[in-house]
């Protein structure tokens, strides 16, 4: 019995008690909430609102108007703080469905309109996703005072407008693509939203945003409804700056054609507000000559015209204006640069040893350079000297020593003489220095003189064009060395000039397919530099004819890459015009077709950040399954090899496996010989039979040799085309992503993966792509990675990594990079090609003693097409480093893209003046409230000064007023009449 009692006394499970406890807790909470909600003030408010709603739900229509007015007052008075849902909206929420039904019953138009006005606000708190009731009732209401409901309501309305518009666009697309069968619509779609009505409402909302510091919201709304061109009418002098800054920042993130329409709208706003330098920057970015003309026509002030001309000159944009031709033609560039050099005390010439610093190299011994070609190292010194003293018009090595040229040999003499042109770059006096070399017997020396004339005249255009007069008579010279040097010189001198006279001279050279491929390729390359980004149809046709008419054997040459590049440069930054050319190329049946297509599309969409195109390029770079070569002999082995090749590791290890297989085969042969030694009779019989068979096979083979050779040629050209495609795809990723910072970061991450998993052709290009993404921007993480790559077992990868280090630090004098390159020079002291590239990289880092840059963008985010074209030419040459080392004159293509990174201030008379400026790191101020600082960590200096990558300058005080907001290059200032000096 006791046990039974104990059993009965066992407590019930705790879960039952918990549920009871939870219920009591919930009841207590509800009571507490009710008490909280129903405080005296709230209870009175709730009672008043319920009474007003009941009045609306009754049939007495006379009271509706006053009741609605009272309700609206309650709501409006509560919306002063939007930290939480306003009490009236909270209390009215349960009545929303009843009020909607009441709206349907009412007949009076004015009363319905007034109720719809209120329901539109209530719908903010009640409406389910995709109902769009707020917008629906707003359109049903005739009242136009949207602003009275406050900022939160207007933003909610703008959000719904965007959603509805996108739904309509999708619906129209579906209607066009699918059959006419009507699909069942959700209930909220029964109300037809008219595009015109939505646009009208949006144009009422935009002015509200503009008045209440919501410029970004206004731009976003007009973007959603595809009406960004309507924006200028709402912008005034107080809002234009923030609006345009936001729009230009958005361009990198927009797909075409919206990016173009944003730039055009920002241009028209700047033009209407007479912000002409900013308008000109956008016109250059769009590449529209009519827009540039409109900027000049917008003012008659000659000083403003001069400032605009200096901006055009810096970007190498040709423009016909008789009074400004000297400035646009860069004829004063040398004068300004030498003024900078004098003020910074840099006129004393340097020699290559000043940057080699061989005396610091402790590991250097008597035997370290044994076996090195001294002529090649002298040639390297010529290049370093040319880059180091570029534009200074004096040096200690070549100009005063005529014998230096003969310390090099063969084609090296051409580059040695041409380096004089680099020393005298932008200065007409350089032509006199080079003239004597045109009367020498050696064709290499004469060719160097011609190339030097082109380099000395790079980007400088006089009325007479002396460089063209001197070079044109050598274009059709019988000696290829002389003719190619003259053509290359013209390409460097007239890069970006769109000179029709040059077109008339060089187009016949490209069109004549009887010329050697080298001559045609160099002529096409020169023309593409002169007409970079112009989509010139005549040059395009001439280059395409070369691809169609030349033999596969000719197109195997590395020069064919420069034909492909010339097409890419013609369409640089012209994504909207490239489709026709790509279609034509696709129609050609040739192994190089796919590679050319990749290069052209990458050039056309440069700096657009096009994610889909980058994905396509990455897809091309992923390893494919590789077919086994002995598939006819053994099917089982073929299956196994294909399975292995599907993995990335096996793909990369293909060569190692082949090498490993060879010794096994030899061992097997030895074993067979041992067995055969025991069977002499059988072997002799077999050998006799084999001899007879071999004789028969030889006769058959001799008949098939021609066909086999043709097939092999086709296969080789296919492989070369595929390899070039991979190389162009890697460069393409860098080209497309170089426009904005996030894209750069992502591309650098991808390059790391490609270096790890890619084949030899991909790995060879990855360092160059990394260098291209960060030209003149020596980030520690980038050049440390490149330093690691510079010790790669593949010497081509190492050389390209070293050159990429030079690109990263071009013109920066970066001490860390200089030290790394000195270490590499010591490491590769026995490897002459790698040492040559290392010397070139050292020359680039110290370009113009640190006063020059090859930065592809300026502070206004304008792409410098001439600079990019010069870099791409050398990078394409470095696909095969041995090729460009043999044709080292191509390195001088870099000279056309070099420009000083100075700030020089002039007064209105054009005289140089000294003004204090602050120089610091540029700060992104887009979308920030108030007037934030545009630079940080600044240092005050007196002009002329140097401006590094990512730096920005501003005037220290108001003593002078600048004619341009972007303080870079040559800036014209005027005295501020209202300036008062501080005591």
Curated annotation (Swiss-Prot):
Region of interest (Disordered), residue spans: 1-44, 169-188, 625-644, 662-724
Pfam family, one: PC_rep
UniProt repeat feature PC, residue ranges: 415-447, 448-484, 485-519, 520-557, 563-595, 768-799, 800-834
Keywords (A to Z) from UniProt: Proteasome, Repeat
Biased composition (Basic and acidic residues): 1-26, 688-705
Function: Acts as a regulatory subunit of the 26 proteasome which is involved in the ATP-dependent degradation of ubiquitinated proteins.
UniProt cross-references to PANTHER family, sorted A to Z: 26S PROTEASOME NON-ATPASE REGULATORY SUBUNIT, 26S PROTEASOME NON-ATPASE REGULATORY SUBUNIT 2
Protein's UniProt name: 26S proteasome regulatory subunit RPN1
The species this protein was found in: Candida glabrata (strain ATCC 2001 / BCRC 20586 / JCM 3761 / NBRC 0622 / NRRL Y-65 / CBS 138) (Yeast)
Designated gene of the protein: RPN1
